[in-house]
Amino acid sequence: MSISLFISGVTGKLGKVVAEELENTESIFLAGGHASASNKNLGKPLNSILNIECKENLISDFNNIDYEIDAVLDVSSIDNFQNLTEFCLKKELPFILASTGHSEDQLSSLKKYSEVLPILIAPNLSLGINLLKKS
């Protein structure tokens, strides 16, 4: 069984590294990716932007997702927080929050959301990514 992971912030430094490392795993695959509305690559297939196999288009609106997702990784900016958390709540998707700079109110809301969703707050994935690359 494989896990389909959606990455919000997939075109950023960390998002690219994670997406490309997923190509080396059999148990997790990239389902799709999200970027800000100003990203010049919106609408393009991810495999034309990154060195990956995923053919889904880069999106900026979570409502445009029409494929299966098992979990979400957020490595985007805090500007995306509200839309992402609402999407995960609506779809009942577990997510890993690896972005930083959240307000106390946002962190408090995460605590509330964690009563109904599995949430991992991991604001520094540098060590984790290095370990993933070595495995």
Regions found by a protein language model. Give the residues of each.
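Structural detector of well-ordered beta-strand residues that form the stable sheet scaffold
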Residues: 31, 59, 96-97, 118-120
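Structural motif
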Residues: 70-71, 94
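Rossmann-fold NAD(P)-binding glycine/threonine-rich loop
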Residues: 79, 84-90, 98-135
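N-terminal Rossmann NAD(P)H-binding glycine-rich loop of SDR-like oxidoreductase domains
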Residues: 7-11, 15-20
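Extreme N-terminal starter segment of soluble prokaryotic enzymes
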Residues: 1-6
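NAD(P)-binding Rossmann-fold cofactor-contacting core
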Residues: 24-50
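Glycine-rich, highly charged phosphate/nucleotide-binding loops
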Residues: 48-67, 73-81
